Amino acid sequence: MAAFSTAATERFVNKMVKHHQKYFPEWSRSLGADELGEFIRHGIERANLHGFETELNIARYLHVMQALGPNFDESGEYPWAERLLNRRLPPQAKMNHLRDAADYELEARRIRNANRD
């Protein structure tokens, strides 16, 4: 999206706001519309830094970011994500690896939480 116009970027932000409100309603309400828009803009910037430029890959990056946190790629909490995102891979391959690793992380978290109960 780095090459897209400001108008195209804002259309994409609005599309992603609606998407998140539909599929993640509680989470979206907890942020509010303005903060959700800022979250998405931040995600677009982070995705672009890692070589993701298509709407599909940026949307997928936003889903990972929503699940792991807005700065998952640099927080130190997920060193595997930082290593993966710094690898020289085609964007689609990098995204596939990122999604698989994030899914694994979320499943491991779910199991840890279930074992605490």
Residue positions per predicted region:
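A contiguous, surface-oriented mixed alpha/beta subdomain in the mid-to-C-terminal portion of proteins
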Residues: 1-117
